[in-house]
């Protein structure tokens, strides 16, 4: 099959829109004699004049050859062997072109996919036509093997190949089809819609971890409400999140209201805002009978300090925090949340319950701002309608408290006495203290007598 090729003059994608680190990888691959294409959703989003979440690269170089080219490269994955080329905190993903893998005997699901192939074979093993577009750095052309350009113009999500077969190979693709259509404002083509309804029960064969990961992506994409509504309409939600399916079926709007608030925040803050899994889990509480407002108002126990502080001062009650963790982990839910995320949410609730109080002393407010999860708890309160003036006041409290906080300094590796490591640990100093002045340490003198542990 001859691909459709759009020359540089026939499309709007420019190198200036591509991440500089991704360009470096593309040019280095080309300079070493390999093909280097920008692939997948990055090409799609740039053609739609949207900001890509990431820039993925396809190449005919093997993972080992890529690793030899880049010292900062790490090979990861089992099902897919991928190369992560690191530039500080940024990662550029490089994948070798693959051809379609066959499922293991007696199974319809492809569990390993490391059979290398050509660019054309790689395009046809991808999920949707709009995700199978390649941008060639050699001549700046866009290569389309599957009809993705036509579907992009028609605002259509179409499966590559037979939808029945492709959804049986990887049932999570059904969730992805719904999520992509909702995020881009596209329609799923009729054949794929019918296939999803026919094979929706196959989703239970997928890893629960992959399903949960897809839900996290949906919650982060800025169109979570619409996506959950469509998952419910297509019948998928009954299998992946039965509690939410039942809530929506009986007309409970709690979940949709929390997702509306989340989407509004994502659109206001942009795609760069990072939300932890714990914050995302909080938006799934309403179908479980736990309104978000309950978790963040008055669940922690107020307990005065016993020292010289005023009557409005408090600390988080460890027993209360422990109770929150127990409540959270005993929730009957079909999604396998990581315990660390559930415990993080419990601590967020304990901190967040104080944010609506108006009787706290300045000292108590300052102490609260020192809590590890204060910023996340404040963020969650902001997402769900906390008064902007109150949010601003709490941020001012946190900034002032941080400015007045004791500073940690580290002495030189080799101090004046010439003994490296004698100042291996930082010292906590009060504001205005001189770091050069060290406290005098006295050695305790041991009384004369027999060695410890010896018989007398």
Regions from the PLM with identified roles:
Residues 1-456:
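Catalytic cores of the polymerase beta-like nucleotidyltransferase superfamily
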């Amino acid at each position: 099959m001859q691909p459709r090729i759009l020359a540089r003059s026939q499309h709007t994608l420019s190198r200036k829109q591509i991440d500089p680190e991704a360009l470096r990888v593309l040019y280095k691959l080309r300079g070493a004699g390999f093909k280097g294409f920008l692939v997948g959703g990055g090409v799609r989003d740039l053609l739609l004049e949207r900001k890509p979440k990431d820039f993925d690269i396809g190449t005919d170089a093997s993972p080992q050859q890529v690793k030899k080219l880049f010292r900062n490269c790490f090979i990861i994955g089992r099902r897919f062997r991928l190369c992560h080329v690191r530039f500080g905190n940024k990662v550029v993903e490089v994948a070798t072109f693959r051809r379609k893998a066959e499922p293991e005997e007696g199974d319809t699901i492809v569990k390993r996919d490391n059979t290398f192939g050509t660019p054309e074979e790689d395009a046809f093993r991808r999920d949707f036509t709009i995700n199978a577009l390649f941008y060639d750095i050699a001549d700046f052309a866009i290569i389309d093997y599957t009809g993705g350009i036509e579907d992009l113009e028609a605002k259509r999500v179409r499966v590559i190949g037979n939808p029945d077969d492709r959804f049986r190979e990887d049932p999570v693709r059904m969730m992805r089809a719904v999520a992509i259509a909702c995020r881009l404002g596209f329609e799923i083509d009729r054949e794929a819609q019918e296939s999803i309804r026919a094979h929706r029960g196959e989703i239970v064969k997928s890893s629960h971890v992959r399903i949960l990961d897809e839900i996290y992506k949906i919650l982060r994409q800025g169109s979570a409400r619409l996506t959950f509504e469509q998952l419910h309409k297509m019948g998928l939600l009954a299998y992946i999140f039965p509690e939410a399916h039942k809530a929506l079926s009986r007309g409970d709007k709690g979940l949709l209201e929390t997702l509306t608030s989340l989407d509004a925040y994502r659109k206001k803050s942009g795609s760069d805002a990072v939300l932890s899994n714990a914050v995302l889990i909080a938006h799934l509480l309403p179908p479980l009978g736990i309104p978000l407002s309950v978790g963040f108002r008055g669940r922690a126990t107020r307990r005065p300090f016993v020292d010289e502080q005023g009557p409005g001062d408090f600390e988080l009650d460890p027993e209360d925090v422990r109770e929150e963790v127990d409540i959270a982990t005993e929730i009957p839910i079909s999604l396998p949340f990581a315990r660390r995320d559930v415990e993080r949410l419990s601590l967020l609730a304990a901190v967040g319950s104080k944010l609506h109080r108006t009787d706290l002393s300045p000292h108590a407010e300052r102490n609260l701002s020192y809590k590890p999860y204060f910023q996340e708890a404040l963020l969650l309160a902001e997402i769900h309608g906390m008064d902007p003036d109150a949010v601003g006041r709490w941020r001012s409290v946190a900034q002032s408290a941080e400015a007045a906080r004791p500073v940690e300094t580290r002495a030189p590796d080799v101090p004046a006495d010439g003994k490296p490591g004698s100042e291996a640990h930082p010292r906590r100093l009060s504001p205005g203290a001189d770091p050069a002045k060290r406290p005098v340490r006295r050695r305790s003198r041991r009384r004369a007598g027999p060695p410890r542990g010896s018989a007398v």
